[in-house]
C-alpha cells in the first residue's frame, strides 16, 4: 500500500511539474505577444478574478473530499451532489453581482480597461466551482490522478486557446487582448471537466 501511495505521489508530482512548466511557458508567451501594458491590464483583472472565485474554490474541495471519504460507499455521491447544489446557489448570486459591479471593480483597480476581463471572469465562478467540487469528490474516493490529468489537459487547452486567439486576432484592442487569457481559462476549464 505504501509503495502504491509513493508511486501515485510521484505521478502527481510529475504531472504538476509539467503543468507548472506549461504555465511558465504561457506567461512567457503572453508577455511576448501582449507586451508590458496589456500584461499589466491582465494582471489587474487576475487579482479580481482570484477574489471572485475564492468563495467556491478555497474550502469546498477539502470539505467535499473529507465528507466523501467518511461516507458509506452507498452515500459517497451525496457530498458531490450537495457541493454541486451549493456551487449553483452561490453562482446564482455571485455571477450577477460580478457582472453588475464589474464597472465599479474596474474603476477600483484604477484602469477601466480591465472590464472585458472581468466580464469573462464572471462565468468562471460557476465553472471553477464545479471543477473544485468534482476534484474534491475524486480525492475523497481516492482517484487523485484524475484531477491531476484534468489540470494538465486544462493547461494544454489554455495554452493552445490563448496562443491561437492572440495569433489569429492580432488587432485586438488592449482591453480585449487582456481578456484573452481569462477567456482561455474559462474555456479550458469547461473542456477539462
Model-inferred region functions:
Residues 4-62, 91-99, 124-125, 159:
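Signature of the first transmembrane helix
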Residues 33-36, 108-111, 140-141, 171, ...:
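Helix-loop interface residues and adjacent transmembrane-helix termini in multi-pass membrane transporters
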Residues 100, 111-134:
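Alpha-helical transmembrane segments of multi-pass membrane proteins
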Residues 12, 16, 43-46, 87, ...:
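Residue-level recognition of transmembrane alpha-helices
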Residues 68, 93-113:
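Short membrane-interface helical motifs at transmembrane helix boundaries
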Residues 3, 34, 38, 52-86, ...:
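Transmembrane-helix boundary and interhelical linker motifs in polytopic inner-membrane proteins
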Residues 128-150:
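Membrane-interface junctions at transmembrane-helix termini in multi-pass inner-membrane proteins
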Residues 150-164, 172-193:
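Hydrophobic alpha-helical transmembrane segments
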Amino acid at each position: 500500500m505504501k509503495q502504491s501511495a509513493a508511486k501515485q505521489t510521484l505521478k502527481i508530482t510529475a504531472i504538476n511539474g509539467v503543468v507548472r512548466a506549461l504555465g511558465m511557458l504561457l506567461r512567457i508567451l503572453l508577455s511576448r505577444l501582449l507586451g508590458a501594458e496589456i500584461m499589466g491590464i491582465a494582471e489587474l483583472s487576475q487579482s479580481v478574478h482570484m477574489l471572485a472565485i475564492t468563495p467556491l474554490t478555497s474550502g469546498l474541495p477539502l470539505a467535499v473530499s473529507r465528507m466523501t471519504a467518511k461516507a458509506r460507499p452507498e452515500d459517497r455521491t451525496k457530498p458531490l451532489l450537495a457541493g454541486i447544489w451549493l456551487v449553483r446557489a452561490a453562482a446564482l448570486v455571485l455571477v450577477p453581482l460580478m457582472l453588475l459591479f464589474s464597472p465599479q471593480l474596474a474603476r477600483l483597480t484604477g484602469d477601466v480597461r480591465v472590464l472585458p476581463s472581468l466580464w469573462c471572469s464572471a462565468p468562471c465562478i460557476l465553472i471553477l466551482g464545479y471543477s473544485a467540487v468534482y476534484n474534491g469528490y475524486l480525492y475523497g474516493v481516492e482517484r487523485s490522478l484524475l484531477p491531476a490529468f484534468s489540470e494538465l489537459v486544462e493547461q494544454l487547452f489554455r495554452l493552445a486557446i490563448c496562443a491561437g486567439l492572440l495569433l489569429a486576432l492580432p488587432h485586438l484592442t488592449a482591453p480585449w487582448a487582456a481578456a484573452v487569457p481569462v477567456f482561455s481559462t474559462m474555456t479550458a476549464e469547461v473542456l477539462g471537466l
